Amino acid sequence: MAPRDIAQLGSADALGALGRGFESCYPDIMELNRRYFGKTIVFCLPGSHYSGRFLVRFTQLLLDCRQIGINTIISQDYSSMVNYARCKVMGANVTRGKYQVPFGGAIEYDYMMWIDSDIAFTSADFFKLLEQDRDIVSGWYIQPGGLTPIVEKMDDEYFKSHGYFEFISEDAMSKRNSLFKADYVGFGWVLIKRGVFESISYPWFAPKLIKIGEDLEDVCSEDVSFCIDAKNAGYDIWVDPKIRVGHEKVLTI
């Protein structure tokens, strides 16, 4: 067997804060309890397997939610087709038609928190998203190559010159301090309020054929497709540059 290790793409804060304790980041537990007691979060976990590291982080997050009175629901599923996997996580059923709602309306919830299986996070990272009180809000992480999965503006002219949209670099993101709007965010670490998916027709993550100018066409991924539909439905997509999580990748050496 070839030796393997985990390459963790992320800041020391995102990857090392697990042992510091939830209370050290949020000393006023009673204030969090006052704001969010009785709220219900559906944690959406698409994927086929999860590391021991993920299990420890996620278990701690569930315990911290319970400590302040947040109800939690876990929805997990998998398909080799990522767009279908995400719809399965939301309890979709093609026989319900294009106007169906998540989980067939059987689950009352306030937020969906989407977490990919290779994200390294802390409870504090989650509660910082929650406190932004936005319909759609994301943190950020690094992809192999040093870019984030975030496009602030899907500029057609840039696409014509490069063959892809301009992703924000790690360096550029690290220099930002304020919440900002984006045209596209990856779905590895994003919080979405109830009402957003309910206002978008099924299938919520169907890849789209997009046209760039007169003669360029491309097929966008499932998360790009959702972002396009959400913006067309009138929702802003927000990014908090102060919420950086880690990104684990398996490395053969």
State where each predicted segment sits:
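Short, conserved alpha-helix that lines the donor NDP-sugar binding/gating region
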Residues: 82-105, 228
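Catalytic donor-sugar/metal-binding loop of nucleotide-sugar-dependent glycosyltransferases
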Residues: 181, 194, 199-206, 211-247, ...
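N-proximal low-complexity "stem/linker" segments adjacent to membrane-targeting elements
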Residues: 30-81
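Short beta-strand-to-loop acidic/aromatic patch adjacent to the donor-nucleotide binding site
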Residues: 98-120
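Residue-level detector of anion-binding/catalytic polar loops
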Residues: 71, 118, 135, 236, ...
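Conserved catalytic core of nucleotide-sugar-dependent glycosyltransferases
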Residues: 90, 122-209
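Short, positively charged low-complexity motifs
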Residues: 1-3, 8, 21
